[in-house]
Amino acid sequence: MTPTPRVPNDGVVRIFRGKGGRGGKAVSVVHGLPRRDLAAVAKDLKKHCGSGGTVKDGAVEIQGDQREKIAERLRAQGYVVKLAGG
């Protein structure tokens, strides 16, 4: 299992690709969103990407490597987005 990346609280939304503990399947993990927005953003991203996802440990997880789609969607909503990690 890969450890959760430490994310600074600087107002930037970071999107990681992870697959640890998921049988080798990739997920896109979105850190840095305000807690009050997590559920609504997760629902919107799942619909936009056409895949499943969840809110876990203060982050949104979307199934598959959807980082580009997620970044595009969040930028359109006014977030400052950075692709991070592999």
Predicted feature residues:
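A generic structural motif
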Residues: 58-64
